[in-house]
Amino acid sequence: MKQYLLSVHMVEGAPARSDEEIQRSYQAVDAFNRELMASGGWVFAGGLLPPDTATVVRAQGGKVVTTDGPFAESKEQIGGFWVIKAADLDAALEIAGRGSAACAGPVEVRPFQDVPEAG
């Protein structure tokens, strides 16, 4: 099984959702997470705080420099993610479609690089 990153994208300036819509989304995501766990596809997941809570860390000239705010100035930021196991890209895309429906937002799918096992 290969691992994939499913990134949930939040669009800056999108219409605010009602408390009821947010609760429905939380419930749908919780059900989706339970499905992933039951199927053996779950590796890890998390929701992120807004981009204004980010700190960028850079090593420059032998020093570590930190900057408040997101790395990229963009209308879209990652709001959360899943790391999943799937048989292939088609299976990962199918899972991402269910995740997108659950969180009511776009989900980007990216495979992890294959890393040789240590030994």
Give the ranges of each region predicted by the language model:
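Conserved, structured core segments of small domains
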Residues: 1-119
